[in-house]
Amino acid sequence: MGGAVSAGEDNDELIDNLKEAQYIRSELVEQAFRAIDRADYYLEEFKENAYKDLAWKHGNIHLSAPCIYSEVMEALDLQPGLSFLNLGSGTGYLSSMVGLILGPFGVNHGVELHSDVTEYAKQKLDFFIRTSDSFDKFDFCEPSFVTGNCLEISPDCSQYDRVYCGAGVQKEHEEYMKSLLKVGGILVMPLEEKLTKITRTGPSAWETKKILAVSFAPLIQPCQSESGKSRLVQLPPLAVRSLQDLARIAIRGTIKKVIHQEAVNKNGNGLKNTPRFKRRRVRRRRLETIVFLDKEVFASRISNPSDDNSSGDLEEERREEEATTPPDAKPEPPVNFLREKVLSLPLPDPLKYYLLYYREK
């Protein structure tokens, strides 16, 4: 699946393309996509394909196409403090983006069939927490991953506000998936080759909406153990945060408010995102394929005055861009204001590092 939008040269350009094509429609979803670089979840030798709107699979590792994840994130209608269950959590890319929206008082659980992929997801999560500035820009709900078949979840597990299944669900398993959902909750899953959004409006009442046609690998059926019994999957416990952890969250939140107020007093409008210098895009001739009598005829579509506001306008646009953008212009490296503020506080170093989650940068 995928290929609905043009490839980007970096993560931001990919997101720009998804916005332009209306796959990303809300600010919260856009912020989450920009905060986590899709390439970080690829193996090193395959990163050149990270910004294409294509699914990627290597062994048991799998990522859906960006346009699919965009539709899923929008359909889930995520809000801070909700509980989320990701069935087939894979690399943890989607779970981490969801965690940026859920905030510190949400619940973020994932079930993955393959133990090697669960380990891969934990490594990627650790890398994100240790190295990404986005961790300090958001209040993060850290995902917890367990290994097992998502069709064997223990029947006494808690229900969730939001559930996503990343594998094709057959009609026979629809009721099972619905049973994982709280009243008022939303379930998004590929059901009979349609990405489907199901909202639980009452104990036995549901609203169903078909979003788009998709092609997902089907759920793998459970295998019985040697004893003939299924292996029940125990989801992570719904643990209450310690007082110490709650204090850290509160202190970090207060510091962020101070930073924002200082920026308002200085600039009048708070912190601004670092400007992104976009590469100038070359206007390429688009190719249209016409299928006629089983033969493909390729017609070159060349820009003309009626198509492209005349070549004179393009030349003027080019000159203006060159005049306003220095040839060696590069965006300034982002500043982690929270980290700088914490390190400047008159506190013992161990407390500073605790407030920073012992992050490397």
From Swiss-Prot:
GO terms for molecular function: protein-L-isoaspartate (D-aspartate) O-methyltransferase activity. Residues 303-335 are annotated as: Disordered. GO terms for cellular component: cytoplasm. Signal peptide: none annotated. Residues 345-348 are annotated as: CUL-box. The active site is at residue 64. Residues 240-250 are annotated as: BC-box. Keywords: Cytoplasm, Lipoprotein, Myristate. It is found in: Cytoplasm. Residues 85-94, 160-164, 181-191 are annotated as: AdoMet binding motif. Residues 303-312 have a biased composition (Polar residues). A lipid is attached at residue 2 (N-myristoyl glycine). Coiled coil: none annotated. GO terms for biological process: protein modification process. Its main location: cytoplasm. At its N-terminus, contains L-isoaspartate and S-adenosylmethionine (AdoMet) binding motifs. Also contains an extended SOCS box motif, where the Cul-box is separated from the BC-box by ~90 residues, within its C-terminus. Belongs to the methyltransferase superfamily. L-isoaspartyl/D-aspartyl protein methyltransferase family. PANTHER family: PROTEIN-L-ISOASPARTATE O-METHYLTRANSFERASE, PROTEIN-L-ISOASPARTATE O-METHYLTRANSFERASE DOMAIN-CONTAINING PROTEIN 2. May act as a substrate recognition component of an ECS (Elongin BC-CUL5-SOCS-box protein) E3 ubiquitin ligase complex which mediates the ubiquitination and subsequent proteasomal degradation of target proteins. May bind to the methyltransferase cofactor S-adenosylmethionine (AdoMet) via the N-terminal AdoMet binding motif, but probably does not display methyltransferase activity. This is Protein-L-isoaspartate O-methyltransferase domain-containing protein 2.
